[in-house]
UniProtKB/Swiss-Prot annotation:
The keyword Hydrolase does not apply. HAMAP family: ATP_synth_b_bprime (MF_01398). It is a single-pass membrane protein. This is ATP synthase subunit b. Belongs to the ATPase B chain family. It comes from the Bacteria. The lineage of its organism: Bacteria, Pseudomonadati, Pseudomonadota, Betaproteobacteria, Burkholderiales. Signal peptide: none annotated. GO terms for molecular function: proton-transporting ATP synthase activity, rotational mechanism; proton-transporting ATPase activity, rotational mechanism. Its main location: membrane.
Length: 156
């Protein structure tokens, strides 16, 4: 093996270059790689956290939508019950009003019947008195009596 001075010089230069690289070049590269891996890890952690928050938000939204649907259905059911109650109340009021109007009409009809009967009694009494007067004024024979009765029938 032939060793010459160039080989030793190259070895010394290589060792100086290796030492220089280890001392001045390698630490900034390692720091840059560490920072980059830390940023990537932080980004992944933030992405996981964001995904978890998004899932939680979706769950909250789904729960709130379900609650809103339930509330809406409950309000609709309550409104239907109130509408039915109001309709029943209106129906009951209308029936009561109709019964009152019918009773009032019956009372008025009864009053008119009573009034008509009283008027008829008065007229019949007046006609009877008038007929009796006419009978007493005339001579009482069979034909005159029949004519007076027919005339009274016609007036009635």
């Amino acid at each position: 093996m032939n060793l010459n001075a160039t080989l030793f010089a190259q070895m010394v230069v290589f060792l100086v270059l290796a030492w220089f690289t280890m001392k001045f070049v390698w630490p900034p590269l390692i720091n840059a790689l560490d920072e980059r891996s830390k940023k990537i890890a932080d980004g992944l952690a933030a992405a996981e956290k964001g995904k978890a928050e998004l899932d939680a938000a979706h769950k909250r939204v789904d729960q709130e939508l379900a609650q809103a649907r339930n509330d809406g259905q409950q309000r609709i059911a309550d409104a239907e019950k109130r509408a039915q109650a109001v309709a029943e109340e209106i129906k009951a009021n209308a029936q009561a009003e109709a019964a009152r109007i019918v009773a009032q009409a019956k009372a008025e009809a009864e009053q008119q019947i009573v009034k008509a009967r009283e008027t008829l009694r008065g007229e019949v009494a007046a006609l009877a008195v008038k007929g009796a007067e006419q009978i007493l004024k005339r001579e009482v024979d069979q034909t005159a009596h029949a004519q007076l009765l027919n005339q009274l029938k016609a007036e009635l």
